Amino acid sequence: MASQNKINLIKIKNHLQNKNFKIGGFLNFKSDASEKIFKLCKTANQSLLVLSFLNKPSDYKKYIKATDILISQNVNTPKIIDQSNLYKFVIMDYFPIANASKYFQKPQIKKILPLAVRALTNLQKPKKKFSGVQVKSQNNLLKDALNGIETFIDHYDHKIQIGFYLNKLVKVSLIKSTEKYRKFKPTLTHGDFFLDNLIYYNQKVYVIDHQDTHYNHPLLDISSLIFDARRSYSTNVEDKLLKLYARRMKLNLKELRSDIH
C-alpha cells in the first residue's frame, strides 16, 4: 500500500469553526478505503465524519458529483454537510455502525438485500443523462479481454500444444458473449455494489464509496450484489432478488435469468 499524506487537522478545525461547527478533537476512523483518509469529530449535538481526498484529489469532485446524483435518484447516501475545495475534504453525516457485511448470514440480511435492490433500481432509472459521467467503452473492454487471453496463451504455449486452437476457441466464445453484451444500453452503475459498500442504519440502506459512479452494463451491479464472489446466498434468496429487480425494472424474468448468467 502506498504511503499516505498527513492531513492538516488544524486547518480542517479552523474551517469548521469558521462555519460555526464547535468541535473538540479528532478521532481515527478505520476504513477499508486505502486512498481516503477518515476522521471522526463531534460537536455538542452530533457526530461528523471528515473525508479527505488529499491522497487522490481527482476523486474529490467525483465524490461530490456522485453524491448529488445518488440523492437526485432517491438513493440514500451519507449527506455532505460542508466541503472545502481548497483542502479537498468533505464533512458528512456519520453513522455509528459498520458496513452491511456484518449482517451476512444474520436475520437483518433479509431486509437489507431487498432494500439494496430498490436502491439500485432507483439509481438505474435516471430522469436525465448526467453530463461529465464516464461511459465505459464496450470496444475497449473487449480489446483488453482479448489481449489478456493472448498473453495467457502465449505464456503457456510451450506447455499447451493446442494453444493456438484454444486461443481461437476462447476468442470465438468471448466475441459471441460480447455480441450479446452490446445489445444493452449503458446505465448508471456504482461499480462495486455489494454489502461492503452499503450501510444499514435505522431500517434504511445507504450507499457509500460511490465516487466511481459511471455508465456501464445495466446488470453489473445486480450481479455484484447477488453473485458476490466473497459470499453466496441460497437459490431461494437469489430468485427473490431477481424477481424484485425484474419487476421494478420492468424486465422479462426469463430473459433476465439468461442474460445475468
Predicted regions and their residues:
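Short, intrinsically disordered, charge-balanced linker/junction segments flanking boundaries
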Residues: N252-H261
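ATP-binding glycine-rich phosphate-binding loop
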Residues: F21-K39
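Active-site activation/catalytic loop segments of kinase-like enzymes and analogous catalytic loops
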Residues: E150-D157, L219-N252
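ATP-binding pocket architecture of kinase catalytic cores
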Residues: K30, K39-K143, D154, R182-K183
